[in-house]
A protein has these predicted regions:
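A short, proline-enriched helix->beta-strand linker immediately N-terminal to the Walker B motif
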Residues: 195-199
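Helix-to-loop junction immediately C-terminal to a conserved catalytic motif
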Residues: 89
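Conserved ABC ATPase "signature" region
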Residues: 104-105, 153-171
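Conserved ABC ATPase signature
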Residues: 176-180, 184
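Catalytic Walker B motif of ABC-type/P-loop ATPase nucleotide-binding domains
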Residues: 201-204
Length: 296
C-alpha cells in the first residue's frame, strides 16, 4: 500500500502565541478538566530540531498537546522519544524551533526561569525513582520540602491526601521502597510526581517490562489520574497497545520525525505505511485493543 502523508490531528501549531490555560481551572466536579479549558493548547512545539554534533536526532517536530487530554508518543528504539521528552520538560534546549508551555516560549529562557517551568511537569519514570534509604512519607513529601515552607505536619497531611486518592492508606508511610510491590511503587512514584499539583504529568515508558495484565492496570491508573486530578498526560512509550488504549492523540515517531498522528482509530485503520508496519510488528490485535480503550 502506498504511503500517503501522515495522518494529522485536528489541531496544529499555526499561531504565534498558543492559548494559555489557567492552572486554577484545571479540575471540575467529576475530575475532568472543564470544557472551557480542556482543549487549550498547553504544550506546543513548532519546527523543533535537535542535533548532537553532525547527527540530527529530531527533524522539524510540530506537536500540540491539549489541556486535559492524553498524548502518547510512540516509537521504536532510536526514534528520538527520549530526546523529545527532555526538550518538552526543559531539561535540554533544541537546536532550533520553539517550545511553548502554557503559552510561553521556553527556548529563550534562562536556567533560573526554566526551574519554574519544570515545576509544571510531574515526572513518572519507568522505574519509580524512589530513594531506598528513606520511607514513603519522606519520598513522597520530598518536593514539598524542596519547594515550600510547609511544616512537617502539613507535609504529612498532603502526602496522606494524595496517597488516599491513589488508593494507598497510611500504613505505607513508614515502609521503605524495598518493601513495596511493583504496583505500589508505581503509585508512590506517581503520588510524588503530583505533590506540587503540576498541570502536566509525563510518563516515561510506564509499561516497559510489564506483563499484559499489569500493563493494563498501569494504563487504568494513568487515565484515572488524569480524570481525578484534571491533568494533561504525556506518555512516552514503545508499547503501541498501551498508546491505543490511552491516547486522545497518538503520535508515531520514526527516525526523528512524526510519521503519523491522530486518534488511535485513525492510525490503526489509516493508510500510512509506517504506522501499518509498526502495528504489524507489534503483533497486537488492534480491534481488541481499541475495544478496551480507557478513552472513548
Amino acid at each position: 500500500m502506498p504511503s500517503g502523508p501522515p495522518v494529522t490531528s485536528a489541531s496544529s501549531p499555526d499561531s504565534d502565541a498558543p492559548a494559555s490555560t489557567s492552572s486554577d481551572a484545571r479540575a471540575s466536579t467529576n475530575g475532568d478538566a472543564p470544557a472551557s479549558t480542556r482543549h487549550r493548547d498547553i504544550v506546543v512545539l513548532k519546527g523543533v530540531r535537535k542535533s548532537f554534533g553532525e547527527t540530527e536526532v529530531l527533524r522539524g517536530i510540530d506537536l500540540v498537546c491539549r489541556h486535559g487530554e492524553t498524548t502518547c508518543i510512540v516509537g521504536g528504539s532510536g526514534a528520538g522519544k527520549t530526546t523529545l521528552l527532555r526538550l518538552v520538560v526543559a531539561l535540554d534546549k533544541p537546536t532550533s524551533g520553539s517550545i511553548y508551555v502554557d503559552g510561553v516560549d521556553i527556548v529563550p529562557m534562562s536556567e533560573r526561569q526554566l526551574t519554574d517551568v519544570r515545576q509544571k511537569f510531574g515526572m513518572v519514570y519507568q522505574y519509580a525513582a524512589l530513594l531506598d534509604s528513606i520511607n514513603v512519607l519522606d519520598n513522597v513529601g520530598f518536593p514539598l520540602v524542596e519547594h515550600t515552607k510547609l511544616s512537617r505536619a502539613e507535609i504529612r497531611q498532603r502526602v496522606v491526601e494524595k496517597l488516599r486518592i491513589l488508593e494507598l492508606d497510611e500504613s505505607v508511610l513508614t515502609k521503605f521502597p524495598a518493601e513495596l510491590s511493583g504496583g505500589m511503587r508505581k503509585r508512590v512514584g506517581l503520588a510524588r510526581a503530583l505533590m506540587l499539583d503540576p498541570p502536566i504529568v509525563v510518563y516515561d515508558e510506564p509499561t516497559s517490562g510489564l506483563d499484559p495484565v499489569t500493563s493494563r492496570a498501569v494504563d487504568d491508573l494513568i487515565d484515572d489520574t488524569r480524570r481525578r486530578f484534571g491533568v494533561t498526560s504525556l506518555v512516552i512509550t514503545h508499547d503501541i497497545a498501551s498508546c491505543f488504549r490511552l491516547a486522545d492523540q497518538a503520535v508515531l515517531l520514526s527516525k526523528g520525525q512524526i510519521a503519523a498522528r491522530g486518534r488511535p482509530q485513525e492510525l490503526a485503520h489509516g493508510d500510512n505505511e509506517i504506522a501499518e508496519d509498526f502495528i504489524r510488528m507489534s503483533g497486537i490485535d488492534v480491534d481488541a485493543v481499541l475495544a478496551g480503550r480507557t478513552r472513548r
